[in-house]
Amino acid sequence: MKITVIGAGNVGATTAFRLAEKQLARELVLLDVVEGIPQGKALDMYESGPVGLFDTKVTGSNDYADTANSDIVVITAGLPRKPGMTREDLLSMNAGIVREVTGRIMEHSKNPIIVVVSNPLDIMTHVAWQKSGLPKERVIGMAGVLDSARFRSFIAMELGVSMQDVTACVLGGHGDAMVPVVKYTTVAGIPVADLISAERIAELVERTRTGGAEIVNHLKQGSAFYAPATSVVEMVESIVLDRKRVLTCAVSLDGQYGIDGTFVGVPVKLGKNGVEHIYEIKLDQSDLDLLQKSAKIVDENCKMLDASQG
């Protein structure tokens, strides 16, 4: 198994290190355009192997030839968000980067599974799929795993309980229009609405929607990377080990939820072939309306981007 991580910034490097620690690949390549950065970080990771008890071969490179025959490619490359900047502000800048990266990947790997992390996430996943020519099942955006984790953590914090006992489902685009579905949110099987007031749940939902921006505002420079990287690793692990995990990911829908041809976050089964099944869960009309509205925003941005490319 060979995995390549494109982008040696905080998200990319943290993802690579966690993948190496879990020994999900025999060979792991960390690639970046800046000379020396991926080489130095990869060597540092590799040297931690004797103490961390892993044997993953970690290589840093600036040459896409070193990514040849990758089974999975994680794209984290792109410009970071700055305070006050929405994911949509990044649209045109990062689309060019993702398009270039995907083209170079496909020159050296015939049929990889691509996991996109670059923002604006749903739109960049569309860009990568469009450029790659791969079946839609093999191009997946990391969004709902992270958004659901944030919602779960806020609920656990509110109740003072273990995060492991909280389950949540956050659908839609990875942005301000995401849809945390309260009816599918539980604590040890107990509906969260039985434990927290509707008013307080609404506040936690809003905090989840702005969770990324909250961290950006704290950091001043850069954005979240520990939780995003951990979310990517959960997805990759399900693919590599064919675990068939049901995770919320940004995938191209084919009529489910009344949405067609748009990448948006919904529950899917992830296995060795990528997206193996899309689950169409029953939603209240209000949540369905929000999901469709979220998808419409993604679709409009994709069409605007396609038009700008001529």
From Swiss-Prot:
Enzyme class at the top of the EC tree: oxidoreductase
Reaction equations catalysed: (S)-malate + NAD(+) = oxaloacetate + NADH + H(+)
UniProt cross-references to Pfam families, sorted A to Z: Ldh_1_C (PF02866), Ldh_1_N (PF00056)
UniProt keywords, alphabetically: NAD, Oxidoreductase, Tricarboxylic acid cycle
GO terms classed as biological process: lactate metabolic process; tricarboxylic acid cycle
CDD domains: LDH-like_MDH
EC number of this enzyme: 1.1.1.37
Binding site for NAD(+): G7, A8, G9, N10, V11, G12, D32, N94, V117, S118, N119
Residues engaged in binding substrate: R81, R87, N119, R150
GO molecular function, one term: L-malate dehydrogenase (NAD+) activity
Active-site residues, record numbering mapped to chain: H174 (proton acceptor)
Function of the molecule: Catalyzes the reversible oxidation of malate to oxaloacetate.
Subunit and partners: Homotetramer; arranged as a dimer of dimers.
Record family assignment: Belongs to the LDH/MDH superfamily. MDH type 3 family.
Name of this chain's protein: Malate dehydrogenase
